[in-house]
Amino acid sequence: MEMKKIYPRTGDRQIVYLRDVITNPNIEVGEYTIYNDFIHDPRDFEKNNVLYHYPINGDKLKIGKFCSIACGAKFLFTSGNHSMKSLSTYTFPIFFDEWELDKKDICTAWDNKGDTVIGNDVWIGYEAVIMSGVKIGDGAIIGTRAVVTKDVPPYTIVGGVPAKPIRKRFDDATIEKLESVCWWNWGEEKIKRNIAAIQSGDITALENAD
């Protein structure tokens, strides 16, 4: 379904459908993904939550469908990563005028980590930080104020600084079935008919959905 409204709840201006407030072509968001912010205007997600995301790098933030992103969650991109390969972490190439350097070499000031990819049905907790280049699998949960520096497998709960796995949400067989069903790709009407199954802990009910 094509979204036609920013706010999913009547009278609630703290939650937005994130896809409908994004203007940056290097940020891709799936349907029904929501962002909640009770401190700032949630429509300012690009400015307040996606940091060091400079066009010169071409790296992207890709967020899947039906994700829930809590207030203050941050996505830190490549330009925030000073190069650790050189003998100094100082970003000389950024100040090319001052040091009479070639502007085209500006990207050598940092280590390029690539795209940041968030799967479908991911819950990112309050003030969590997702570092550049991280891949988070479908159904994962990122704990409050966790700092995620490494990839997170599907349906895994992580927390802490740096974030470490706490446990899997389900056994491997159930996770495999969930990844096969991919309910988030169903049409709106099928989802409506099967919300009870989606909210249950019964994978068989989900597999048998019509």
Residue map of PLM features:
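Structural signal for interior beta-strand "rungs" in well-ordered beta-sheet cores
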Residues: 15-82, 93-98, 105-165
